[in-house]
C-alpha cells in the first residue's frame, strides 16, 4: 500500500483496509477517525457488540491471545495495517504476520511486543535508555514477591506485568498488605502471566500523559516527532477518573518530559500516537509507562485539540500530516456504570448537555459493572479550572439506571 498519498473506497477492490485488535471506547474513536478518511475498518475483540464493533465495517470475536485464531482472522481479512488497541494479544503471532508480509503492524511488531507488558518497557526505559524511573523489581512467585517488597521497601506499588485500567494494582503499606496484594495482582492480570512488578513509591506532585506522535513530515517525507500539550489527570486505584489539558508545569519539567517521550518513542519506532505516562515533582520528571496507542486520559483531546488523539493516530498511521495544536483548555470526567447489568440506560443527559461547553461520549458497552467506565463527560472553558468544574458537573448529571 502506498502510504500517505492514496486512499481507496471502502468495500471495493481499491479499499485501504485497517484491522483494529481491541474495539473498546478508544478503538471506537480510532475507527470513526479512520472512516472519515474513507478507510475500510475491521474490528476484533474478545466479546460481541463491543463499542468499536458497532461502528466498524466488519466485526470478529476471537481470543486475541490465541496465535492461531489471530493468524486466521488476518489471513481472512487481509488488512494492510494492523492496529493493536489493547495489551492482551499474541504478539509473537503479530511478529510472524509482519515478517511474512501479510500486514504492517502499528507502530511495529517489536514495539507491540515490548509494550505488551510492564517488564519489557521498563527494562527498555531504565536499562537501555537510562531514563529516570522509580526503583523496581519483578517477581513470579509469592516468595520472590515478598523478597522484592523487602528490597524495594514500603510503601510500594504492585502491578501485574500485564493489565490495564488499574486492574490488579494496589499499594503495600504494611506486612499485612503483602499477601492480599499478591492475590489481587494474580486475579487482575489481563492474561494468566503470574508475574508482577514492584515499584518504589515516588513522592510526585502530579502525573501527566505526554501524548507523542510519530508521523511523516510533509516537508521532508521523514518521520518526525510531534507533541501535544501535557495532559494532567487524577487516578484512583490505578484507573483514570478525570483528565485535563493543558497541565501547568515549569518550562524545565516540560522540556524534560518531552525529551523522555522522544527517547522512548524513538526507540520503539514506527508511526502513530503514543501515550507516555510521567511523574513530576517541581523540575524533576520520572518515566512511568508508555502505550503505543491512544490513551484513556487523552479522551480530553476530543474537546481540547483541533485534531483529537484518535485523529492524530489515524493520520499518523496512514502517513498523513498531523496538527496537535491545542484549541481550548478542556477536561474530561468519567461516567461509571454504577450497577451490574446488561443494557442499562442513562438519565440526566439533557441536564448534562446543558452545562456550558459540555459534551458527552456514551460508549455503548453492552454490559455495565459498578466501576466500569461507561462514558465520559467533556467540557471546554476559559481556564483548566473552569473546564474541570464543568466536566465534573456534566458527569454528575448522568445517572445510569436499570432498563428492566
Curated annotation (Swiss-Prot):
ATP binds at residues 118, 159, 164-169, 199-202, 207. N(1)-(5-phospho-beta-D-ribosyl)glycinamide binds at residues 25-26, 85, 296, 365, 372-373. Gene3D superfamilies: 3.40.50.20, ATP-grasp fold, A domain, ATP-grasp fold, B domain. GO terms for biological process: 'de novo' IMP biosynthetic process. It comes from the Bacteria. It is an enzyme of class 6 (ligase). Keywords: ATP-binding, Ligase, Magnesium, Metal-binding, Nucleotide-binding, Purine biosynthesis. The keyword Cell inner membrane does not apply. Disulfide bonds: none annotated. Signal peptide: none annotated. SUPFAM superfamilies: Glutathione synthetase ATP-binding domain-like, PreATP-grasp domain, Rudiment single hybrid motif. One of its GO terms (cellular component) is cytosol. Mg(2+) binds at residues 277, 289. Belongs to the PurK/PurT family. HAMAP family: PurT (MF_01643). Involved in the de novo purine biosynthesis. Catalyzes the transfer of formate to 5-phospho-ribosyl-glycinamide (GAR), producing 5-phospho-ribosyl-N-formylglycinamide (FGAR). Formate is provided by PurU via hydrolysis of 10-formyl-tetrahydrofolate. This is Formate-dependent phosphoribosylglycinamide formyltransferase. The gene is purT.
Amino acid at each position: 500500500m502506498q502510504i500517505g498519498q492514496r486512499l481507496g473506497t471502502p468495500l471495493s477492490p481499491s479499499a485501504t483496509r485497517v484491522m483494529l485488535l481491541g474495539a473498546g471506547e478508544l478503538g471506537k474513536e480510532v475507527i470513526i477517525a479512520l472512516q472519515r478518511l474513507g478507510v475500510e475498518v475491521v474490528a476484533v475483540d474478545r466479546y460481541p457488540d463491543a463499542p468499536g464493533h458497532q461502528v466498524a465495517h466488519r466485526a470478529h470475536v476471537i481470543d486475541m491471545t490465541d496465535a492461531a485464531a489471530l493468524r486466521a482472522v488476518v489471513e481472512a481479512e487481509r488488512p494492510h495495517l494492523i492496529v493493536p488497541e489493547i495489551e492482551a494479544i499474541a504478539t509473537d503471532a503479530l511478529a510472524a504476520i509482519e515478517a511474512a508480509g501479510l500486514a504492517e503492524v502499528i507502530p511495529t511488531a517489536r514495539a507491540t511486543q515490548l509494550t505488551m507488558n510492564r517488564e519489557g518497557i521498563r527494562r527498555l526505559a531504565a536499562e537501555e535508555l537510562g531514563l529516570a524511573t522509580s526503583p523496581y523489581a519483578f517477581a513470579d512467585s509469592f516468595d520472590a514477591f515478598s523478597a522484592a517488597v523487602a528490597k524495594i521497601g514500603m510503601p510500594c506499588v504492585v502491578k501485574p506485568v500485564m493489565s490495564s485500567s488499574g486492574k490488579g494494582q494496589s499499594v503495600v503499606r504494611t506486612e499485612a498488605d503483602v499477601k492480599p496484594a499478591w492475590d489481587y495482582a494474580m486475579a487482575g492480570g489481563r492474561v494468566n502471566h503470574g508475574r508482577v512488578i514492584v515499584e518504589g513509591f515516588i513522592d510526585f506532585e502530579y502525573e501527566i500523559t505526554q501524548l507523542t506522535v510519530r508521523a511523516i513530515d510533509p516537508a521532508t517525507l521523514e518521520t518526525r516527532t510531534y507533541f501535544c500539550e501535557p495532559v494532567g489527570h487524577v487516578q484512583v486505584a490505578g484507573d483514570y477518573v478525570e483528565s485535563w489539558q493543558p497541565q501547568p508545569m515549569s518550562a524545565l519539567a516540560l522540556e524534560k518530559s518531552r525529551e523522555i517521550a522522544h527517547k522512548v518513542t524513538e526507540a520503539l519506532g514506527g508511526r502513530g500516537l503514543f501515550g507516555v505516562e510521567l511523574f513530576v515533582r517541581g523540575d524533576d520528571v520520572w518515566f512511568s509507562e508508555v502505550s503505543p496507542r491512544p490513551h484513556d486520559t487523552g479522551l480530553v483531546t476530543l474537546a481540547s485539540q483541533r485534531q483529537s488523539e484518535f485523529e492524530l493516530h489515524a493520520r499518523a498511521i496512514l502517513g498523513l500530516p498531523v496538527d496537535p495544536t491545542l484549541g481550548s483548555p478542556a477536561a474530561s470526567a468519567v461516567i461509571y456504570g454504577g450497577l451490574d447489568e446488561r443494557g442499562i440506560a442513562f438519565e440526566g443527559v439533557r441536564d448534562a448537555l446543558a452545562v456550558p461547553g459540555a459534551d458527552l461520549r456514551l460508549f455503548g458497552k453492552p454490559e455495565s459493572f459498578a466501576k466500569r467506565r461507561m462514558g465520559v463527560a467533556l467540557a471546554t472553558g476559559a481556564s483548566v479550572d473552569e473546564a474541570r468544574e464543568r466536566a465534573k458537573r456534566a458527569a454528575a448529571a448522568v445517572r445510569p439506571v436499570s432498563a428492566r
